[in-house]
């Protein structure tokens, strides 16, 4: 689910996007590839009943809250099974082609397959940001990035 614009839960990437490639690489059937629009209705989302939701962008926490608190989303398998995840936000978008792209894959693998992967995302972010941007980050700052928060730990919207 895209959250770069405040378009709500029904805003996603479609076939041919980098996120389709990424989630197919991680072993998923990317639902966005089967949709005819990047803004499916509530009914289309319910009919698909995804096993996992992944939310990115500055509105990710707003969308995650909607999924977890509003009908009809609260009845979806991903929500009931607590498989609603975020994509970190940093100096560049993690889910777009950037210095953070490899970390995006490691982070998502940790979240989606915790029984198999335990990558040290905090260290990866700190090392990458230092190398590419010349900036030292604290664990707290990295935590904000990993949780989709602003540099002070507050909401991005």
Where are these regions (language model features)?
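N-terminal ligand-binding lobe of clamshell/alpha-beta domains
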Residues: 1-157
């Amino acid at each position: 689910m895209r959250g770069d614009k405040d378009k709500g839960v029904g805003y996603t990437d479609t076939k041919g996007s980098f996120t389709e490639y990424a989630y197919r690489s991680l072993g998923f059937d990317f639902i966005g590839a089967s949709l005819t629009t990047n803004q499916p209705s509530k009914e289309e989302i319910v009919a698909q009943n995804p096993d996992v939701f992944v939310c990115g962008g500055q509105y990710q926490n707003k969308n995650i809250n909607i999924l977890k608190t509003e009908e009809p989303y609260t009845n979806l398998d991903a929500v009931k099974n607590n498989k609603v995840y975020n994509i970190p936000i940093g100096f560049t978008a993690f889910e777009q082609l950037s210095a953070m792209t490899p970390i995006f894959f490691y982070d998502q693998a940790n979240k989606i397959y915790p029984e198999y992967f335990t990558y040290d995302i905090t260290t990866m972010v700190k090392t990458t940001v230092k190398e590419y941007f010349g900036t030292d980050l604290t664990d707290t700052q990295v935590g904000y990035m990993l949780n989709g928060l602003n540099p002070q730990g507050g909401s991005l919207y």
